[in-house]
Amino acid sequence: NAALKTGGKVIGVIPEFLKKGENINLNNSKTIVVKTMSQRKKILFEKGDAFLILPGGSGTIEEATEIISWKILGIHTKPIIIFNYKNYWQSLYDIYQNAKKSKFGKINLQSISINVKTLSKFKSLFN
């Protein structure tokens, strides 16, 4: 809603099977209903100007690691903002750091994302 209040455009993309269990924001500029999670991710990737990763569960973790991997592979150059509130995502940063240290990865997550740890810093990104 904050993005809409400042003139931003918000597009929601939700698979049909999640419509009943999820809260759909009726204020979105547009809501797109798709059949599969893969279709959802494809549309989010195509339409997104940046990727904002909030604390979440297994679906969020899967989507986050995919978009991070795509950036590492050079598939996109869009900003990735990680809201690391109360160090929620610290273990993810640690995994990428360990991969680099162990020579299984070339990039640490810190170098390709914006790590935001406080609500005030998070809000300042959008003002």
What spans do the regions from the language model cover?
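A cross-family phosphate/adenosyl-ligand binding-site feature
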Residues: 1-47, 83-127
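Short glycine-rich anion-binding loops that position phosphate/pyrophosphate groups of nucleotides
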Residues: 16-18, 56-59
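Short glycine-/polar-rich loops that comprise or flank the Walker A/P-loop
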Residues: 49, 76-78, 111
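Short, proline-centered helix/strand-breaking motifs
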Residues: 55, 74-84
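Short glycine/serine/threonine-rich phosphate/pyrophosphate-binding segments
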Residues: 59-66
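Glycine-rich, phosphate-binding/catalytic loops in enzymes
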Residues: 68-70, 99
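Arginine/glycine-rich "motif VI" loop of SF2 helicases in the C-terminal RecA-like domain
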Residues: 70-78, 104-106
